[in-house]
Amino acid sequence: MGTVTHEMLVHGFLEDSNLLEGVGAVYVLACDFLQTTQKYANRGYRYALLEAGHAAQNAYLWCAEQGIGVVEIGGFNDKAFSDLISLAYPHQAPLTTLLVGRRKL
């Protein structure tokens, strides 16, 4: 997968580079839809979205407990972002991202 630089994130994912100010890590919650739908048929798609939401919520709760800022970003170009992080789109795709380390607003 390799390293994704600040510039790559801005051009391939975020339009507002200010969102990355103070960010220590970017977590991408992604899914391999071939895996989930093979086991659960069409429900696999819904399950993946639910699980991503649960994981993001748990990350928010942990960050709040630790006093760490976190921002969830779900609005991005799926194909461009998948290419940036080497996912085999559309079978693999990012569902949401968490920018961790931002100061609390």
Residue ranges and their predicted role:
Residues 1-105:
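Acidic, surface-exposed loops and disordered segments
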